[in-house]
């Protein structure tokens, strides 16, 4: 009898341990990547192929189509549709700037996220995939294409050099000549240009010409007005930027947000250029490139920004608007405007590009970094089938990492960079802008299984005795 009971207990414990130690099933409803971020065009197709998602998505679109959107969204059926769709691929989908069917992709994105927002938010999440490239990549390509670095020869007119470099590239020359011609074409005695056509031509230029050329035209470093004024004139501001009167900034924001494309570019600008005083550069993720890319993405829309003057001592950027007539919303308006005019992230990013510098960063929350050559005699033994690749280090990188630790993080003004990563960071966080979804429950289950295993023989021994 005792042996029979012991046998039953063994079977029970074995089954329990199997269930605890087994890997978790993928999140979501099936294995089609429901919780894996995909572009919104693909997400829309996945949703259409699943009956429940498809019907709820149609319901939500009807809820958002009415004039009184907030009242409709308060409806129980609309709320139920939103809850279901938050578990669908539509919730995590993103778009890519300049992608084919970009407008269609953004329409899908906002059809979900406008329903989730409670009224108008001051800052909205960006619908675009995060930018992972750095300014150093732009510098390298610029030197390859033009034969010189963006900031070489301090006595030269960098903006003139940028125009020359553009003229040497057929695509850049063609699209630049196209928008200058369109924006300078007089329509009538009362209408000196077509702003709509001018904006469209500008968007074609900045969306289709590589940043190696467009950045040099927009952000060239200037020491005199002979350079700074052509830089200000890059976007033909008398047509694309200036107007007879300055509208209220909040009114201009409302006009922009009425268009999915303009709304997306504005949200992306705030996401990548919003001043962060907890970072070295004042930029989110210390990424100058992401901020400058978002800035250029706004050109060619109602919210087009530009230099307010040809000053060489300070950089001031602003859309063509003011806060006059804001009434009770003056504080909100001033805050919105300061994100352009007094933005340390944007200013630092422009200056960094003009100077040909980028920031060299170590991880924000690193494991103990590698700062000295490993001592072989103290290294733990590894299995025979595993190569000890960590024992081979570049001494120049180690010296750089040590220097950063001793003297604090500084802007890297050299052409070549060496990033300081810990062993854990090198294997698990090589792309900091992308998130990895980890099931915390699964990890806990494996730990519990490890704790239970040693106790099994003791239980069996007591039963047998």
From Swiss-Prot:
The record's Pfam families line, in alphabetical order, gives: GDNF
Q: Does the keyword Cell inner membrane apply?
A: no
Q: How does it sit in the membrane?
A: Lipid-anchor; GPI-anchor
List UniProt keywords, sorted A-Z: Cell membrane, Disulfide bond, Glycoprotein, GPI-anchor, Lipoprotein, Membrane, Receptor, Signal
Statement: the UniProt record of this protein carries the keyword Phosphoprotein:
no
Q: What residue ranges constitute the propeptide? A: 446-465
- Any one cellular-component term (Gene Ontology): external side of plasma membrane
Extract the signal peptide range: 1-21
Q: Which domain of life is it from?
A: Eukaryota
The molecular function terms of the Gene Ontology recorded here are:
glial cell-derived neurotrophic factor receptor activity
Question: Biological process GO annotation list?
Answer: glial cell-derived neurotrophic factor receptor signaling pathway; nervous system development
Residue intervals passing through the bilayer: none
Which locations, inside or outside the cell, does it occupy?
Cell membrane
The cysteines joined by S-S bonds are 40-93, 47-53, 63-78, 95-105, 159-220, 166-172, 183-198, 193-239, 222-227, 249-321, 256-262, 273-291, 283-345, 323-333
Glycosylated positions are 355, 387, 412
Which residues are modified by lipidation (GPI-anchor amidated serine)?
Answer: 445
This protein's major location comes to membrane
Q: According to its UniProt entry, what is the function of this protein?
A: Receptor for neurturin (NRTN), a growth factor that supports the survival of sympathetic neurons. NRTN-binding leads to autophosphorylation and activation of the RET receptor.
Subunit and interaction comment = Interacts with NRTN ligand and RET: forms a 2:2:2 ternary complex composed of NRTN ligand, GFRA2 and RET receptor.
**Family as reported in the entry's similarity comment:** Belongs to the GDNFR family.
Q: What is this protein called?
A: GDNF family receptor alpha-2
Q: What is the organism of origin for this protein?
A: Gallus gallus (Chicken)
